[in-house]
Amino acid sequence: MKKIFDDIYVGSNIISKLNDYTEDFDKILIFSNETIADLYFEKFKSTLNEKDKVFYFAIKDGEEYKNIESILPVYDFMLENNFSRKSLIISLGGGVICDMGGYISATYMRGIEFIQVPTSLLAQVDASVGGKVAINHPKCKNMIGSFKNPYRVIIDVEFLKTLPKREFKSGMGELLKHSFLTKDKSYLEYIENNVEKIKNLDNEVLENIVEQSIRIKKHYVDIDPFEKGERAFLNLGHTYAHALESFFDYKAYTHGEAVSKGIIFDLELSLLRGQIDKEYLERARNIFKLFDIDTDLIYLPSDKFIPLMRKDKKNSFNKIITILLDSEGHLSKTEVKEDEIVKIIDKYKNNFLRASIDIGTNSCRLLIAEVEKDNENITFKKEIYKDLEIVKLGEDVNKNKFLKEEAIERTLKCLKKYRKIIDKYSIEEKNIICFATSATRDSTNKDYFIKKVFDETKIKINCISGDKEAYINFKGVISSFDRDFKDNILVFDIGGGSTEFTLGNMQGIEKKISLNIGSVRITEKFFLNNKLYNYSEENRIKAKDWVKENLKELEDFKKLNFSLIGVAGTTTTQVSVREKMEVYDSEKIHLSNLTSKEINDNLSLFIKNINKQEIKGLDPKRKDVIIGGTIILKEILDYFGKDFIIVSENDNLMGAILEGVENK
């Protein structure tokens, strides 16, 4: 362990050091979020000596909970347990927890001591040091706050071993910012020379870069503790970043991701004013690229984005203030004009938002993504927003051959909601792709439905063929793999009314077919009678035989070698149930393996509990069709003799983003 300042320690496996600083307090509150609590509360209970005076409080995880509503219950808890001015708060978590814990300590009984134990890289190099503590106002980030220095800061780089990759990269964005804030470029060169060791979480290198970042930040904090002058330079990249976070409701981009883009914005402005050259800008871009951090700005409407930049706390007299630098490392705080902002953002017209909507038999889904256009090729860069609603558009369509009015109304309500979200993000009409699948194409009144949706939402629906659906599914899945991936894959999508199969590889599609077997269709055919569900063994056997008979059309596929990849709700739900997910985690699901045995286990669980109790990981709105869908899934594996499949989150929504759905 290294003492880098009187109150700041950096090292590995140094949590026990806390015992040296807790003896003089009558009560201790370990304040964290639910994710960190699950990982580390037990370790703290075994590490801290005076266990009878230690209390624990965990809030929900996320920037959206960094508000007064989340803090009031903490005050209540502290009052109920007789916390006094001689009590201590230990903030255990990332930037949100460090900010909130500091704010609580600054305001409870007009101030008590607190210790920061930052668990994310972002918090270790930023939020835990400097004494700025704050919570968010609904209209602006960090608007309600104070200045209060922690009693101690204990930085243990071992925490970074359990940090998700995205969060580590977010911290690197803020850490790299510090390398631009010093004229001495040795720190920047050290980072460039140790990229692989940093990525591999080498303790010695991590300790060095965290220490150096803290020294740079502490320099500015010490000469300007209340941010009246040079400390503002620490806000390099933050004017753009805070506006970007606000535009997307603090959900699409982590703080470090936004700051990385914001640094490039400030450097673009520095270039525009002739303070740096293109080579300097490109070197900066490349440094971020070494850590797979995207720094391209997004082409957003200036009439919505510029007002958000005006709300930054550096501003006054209605001026937008940001930080510039020159090639020698001199920093300056300056006003940026609206025409300069427009000129910079216009350089990124090929980096924009695109939306795709899938109107299925059972559900409607929306994906909004950041994409890049190069000539006519679209590259997916980032998921911005994703949603699913069970609308049951295809209710009884297999029997009646038309879409019921109440089903249309349910779907229309969902599409009106999606229209509002799309409009909020100012997505151009040409970048809204909406397609309908099996239920719509099987109905006799599809033209009425399509016209009604357009009249009331201005969303243009393309009713696509099974072949087209298979094509965009494949394109969505294959985007997950590197270009040098050579294996054949067979992608299947169990929808509500049909299941699409597409065989191919990175070079293209070889075969595709759409079969009229789907989770809604099988349920209505074998398990639903007069609105009552009957999953008897006899009905299940009939359903399995029906699926097997339909799968015979895949005889040509059976002779080939391929990896089997499943997409869409029936398949992804199997993983969320296996993992007992209370909150759906698409990153954990994407490209995970799912075995035949696990599918069998899930099917038994569904049959046993479908009408009795909630099943963790199963959306209650999907339970009506999950047994039928799981039977189809299991029969597909059995037909091809596969012990497992790969589960992909990328499907026709992604394919539509990349390829569109118009016939070419």
Swiss-Prot record:
InterPro entries: ATPase_NBD (IPR043129), Dehydroquinate_synthase (IPR050071), DHQ_synth_AroB (IPR016037), DHQS/DOIS_N (IPR030960), DHQS_C (IPR056179), Ppx_GppA_N (IPR003695). Its EC number is 4.2.3.4, 3.6.1.-. One of its GO terms (biological process) is amino acid biosynthetic process. It comes from the Bacteria. Zn(2+) binds at E174, H238, H255. Keywords: Amino-acid biosynthesis, Aromatic amino acid biosynthesis, Cobalt, Cytoplasm, Hydrolase, Lyase, Metal-binding, Multifunctional enzyme, NAD, Nucleotide-binding, Zinc. The keyword Iron does not apply. Its cofactor is NAD(+); Co(2+); Zn(2+). It catalyses: 7-phospho-2-dehydro-3-deoxy-D-arabino-heptonate = 3-dehydroquinate + phosphate. One of its GO terms (cellular component) is cytoplasm. Its main location: cytoplasm. It is found in: Cytoplasm. NAD(+) binds at residues 61-66, 95-99, 119-120, 132, 141, 159-162. HAMAP family: DHQ_synthase. Monomer. This is Bifunctional 3-dehydroquinate synthase/phosphatase. It comes from Fusobacterium nucleatum subsp. nucleatum (strain ATCC 25586 / DSM 15643 / BCRC 10681 / CIP 101130 / JCM 8532 / KCTC 2640 / LMG 13131 / VPI 4355). The lineage of its organism: Bacteria, Fusobacteriati, Fusobacteriota, Fusobacteriia, Fusobacteriales.
